[in-house]
């Protein structure tokens, strides 16, 4: 590893950080309420350098797509945004991640509280099979010991925002595992929304879904972005073009993953500045 300050597990040190030299902050929108920003992020798994000098702004209340070939560090970067990489043995990180201007790796940060603000939806739907649909939505509240006066209203609100209420309102007491794959993924989105996050991280949320279910999830993503910041990893270029406002193209060319280019999605897909970006979005490799 290099001389950048390393952060591993619960032993976090933010006295010195790598300065962002090769980063490509998105050029539209401002980091503000519900906004994210990274500066000079490096990640290692033991001695393997996975990400190098990732500096990126995520404009508030919009969708940022992370695109690039498999193995370039997109999902790892997503984990860094709410410190989920700390669950992986041998993981180490250097750099800074800001949520609403506050460094989430600073000493004394309440990691559990931070993760309530930065929710996550995984690649495969993962409802709790032993719980009903309603219990699944409210599970996060119970785990975080958050008291809610009107659970019925919150349940309807979250399922409505996830585009699922009309489909399940008459069977809230049936198992979450009884739903179709697409419905299960929207149930997981509703579960993430119940704790009122400012940011939602989505790691290929449609990769296991059929086209019709994918469309419904995409519609949900676009609607949610009106009042929250969404970061989505996708290998589907058509999906990236449909749902994201901005894109960052990651690439690993025999070394750690870096950002080749980041800009408005319309620019990335029509007039990218780097030929490697053009080759990727046009399907010449990856």
Model-derived features: where do they sit?
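Short helical segment in ABC ATPase nucleotide-binding domains corresponding to the A-loop/adjacent helical element
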Residues: 82, 133-143, 152, 156
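ABC ATPase NBD coupling module
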Residues: 90-92, 103-119, 143, 268-272
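Conserved ABC ATPase "signature" region
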Residues: 96-103, 149-170
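Conserved ABC ATPase signature
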Residues: 173-179, 183
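Conserved catalytic motifs of ABC-family nucleotide-binding domains
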Residues: 196
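Catalytic Walker B motif of ABC-type/P-loop ATPase nucleotide-binding domains
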Residues: 200-203
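Conserved beta-strand-loop-alpha-helix hinge in the C-terminal portion
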Residues: 252-282
């Amino acid at each position: 590893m290099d001389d950048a300050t390393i952060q591993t597990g619960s032993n976090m040190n933010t006295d010195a950080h790598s300065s962002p030299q090769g980063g490509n902050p998105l050029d539209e929108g401002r980091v503000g309420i519900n906004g994210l920003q990274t500066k000079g992020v490096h990640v290692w798994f033991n001695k393997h350098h996975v990400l190098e000098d990732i500096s990126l702004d995520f404009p508030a209340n919009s969708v940022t797509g992370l695109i690039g070939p498999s193995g370039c560090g997109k999902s790892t970067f997503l984990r860094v945004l709410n410190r989920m990489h700390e669950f992986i043995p041998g993981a180490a990180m250097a750099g800074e991640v800001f949520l609403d201007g506050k460094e989430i790796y600073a000493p004394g940060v309440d990691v559990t509280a931070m993760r309530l603000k930065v929710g996550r939806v995984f690649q495969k739907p993962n409802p709790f099979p032993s719980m009903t649909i309603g219990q699944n939505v409210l599970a996060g509240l119970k785990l975080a010991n958050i008291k809610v006066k009107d659970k019925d209203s919150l349940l309807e609100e979250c399922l409505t925002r996830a585009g699922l209420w009309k489909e399940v309102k008459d069977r809230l007491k049936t198992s979450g595992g009884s739903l179709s794959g697409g419905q299960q993924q929207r149930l997981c989105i509703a579960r993430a929304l119940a704790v009122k996050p400012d940011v939602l991280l989505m790691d290929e949320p449609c990769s296991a879904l059929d086209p019709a279910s994918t469309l419904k999830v995409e519609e949900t993503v676009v609607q949610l972005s009106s009042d929250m910041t969404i970061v989505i990893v996708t290998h589907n270029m058509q999906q990236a073009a449909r749902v994201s406002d901005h894109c960052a193209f990651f690439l690993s060319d025999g070394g750690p993953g870096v950002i080749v280019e980041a800009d408005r999605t319309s620019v990335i897909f029509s007039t990218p500045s780097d030929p490697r970006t053009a080759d990727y979005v046009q399907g010449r490799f990856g």
